[in-house]
């Protein structure tokens, strides 16, 4: 009975969510697209013709927005889960943390890339502090990978959670990049500890 009540509450919440409704109008696969749109509007991440890597891409709303924005550029997306095709997007089904997957990504670019984004998060354990730690580890691995892949003026965007690893992630960002900001989009649910770290210009 409790599970059914939770499911009904979730469904009702989704129906009331303006970003869920707007995503259906705009053709995005998830409301998370609007988080990236807000980030882009504030921090000027994307433009036509650039090269981008999207880590943890499924179900694909970030890749959809990036594809529409970079147009003639190059976009490579990776996720453990397969997803429907997206125009102007090369998709890899695999675990980003595997070296083999990282080598596949590198092989698809002849030179350094302009942007790396990550919306990766672990499967939730139900213990928020543990989830924050594991997701933080993914963010730091993505950040270290971006150092290898980005041009000097490159940009890195990643989901992070407020928790014990938060300061460590920000410190790593400041070690690797000249400009580091933490931002919580309006489209991120108020009750969520989710924020995003935006880094620019490699040291």
From Swiss-Prot:
S-adenosyl-L-methionine binds at residues 60, 62, 79, 95, 119. GO terms for cellular component: cytoplasm. The gene is rlmE. Its main location: cytoplasm. It is found in: Cytoplasm. One of its GO terms (molecular function) is rRNA (uridine-2'-O-)-methyltransferase activity. Its EC number is 2.1.1.166. It comes from the Bacteria. Belongs to the class I-like SAM-binding methyltransferase superfamily. RNA methyltransferase RlmE family. It catalyses: uridine(2552) in 23S rRNA + S-adenosyl-L-methionine = 2'-O-methyluridine(2552) in 23S rRNA + S-adenosyl-L-homocysteine + H(+). The active site is at 159 (proton acceptor). The keyword Metal-binding does not apply. This is Ribosomal RNA large subunit methyltransferase E.
């Amino acid at each position: 009975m409790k599970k059914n009540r939770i499911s009904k509450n979730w469904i009702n919440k989704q129906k009331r969510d303006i970003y869920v409704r707007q995503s259906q109008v705009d053709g995005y696969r998830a409301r998370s697209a609007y988080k990236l749109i807000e980030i882009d509007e504030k921090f000027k991440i994307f433009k036509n013709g650039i090269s981008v890597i999207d880590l943890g891409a499924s179900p694909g709303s970030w890749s959809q927005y990036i594809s529409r924005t970079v147009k003639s550029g190059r976009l490579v997306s990776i996720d453990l889960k397969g997803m429907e095709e997206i125009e102007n997007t090369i998709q890899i089904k695999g675990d980003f943390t595997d070296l083999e997957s990282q080598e596949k990504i590198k092989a698809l670019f002849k030179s350094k890339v302009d942007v790396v984004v990550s919306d990766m998060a672990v499967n939730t354990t139900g213990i928020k502090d543990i989830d924050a730690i594991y997701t933080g580890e993914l963010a730091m691995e993505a950040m270290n990978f971006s150092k290898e892949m980005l041009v000097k003026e490159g940009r890195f965007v990643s989901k992070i959670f407020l928790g014990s690893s938060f300061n460590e992630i920000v410190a790593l960002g400041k070690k690797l990049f000249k400009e580091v900001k933490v931002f919580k989009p309006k489209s991120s649910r108020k009750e969520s500890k989710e924020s995003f770290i935006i880094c620019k210009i490699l040291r």
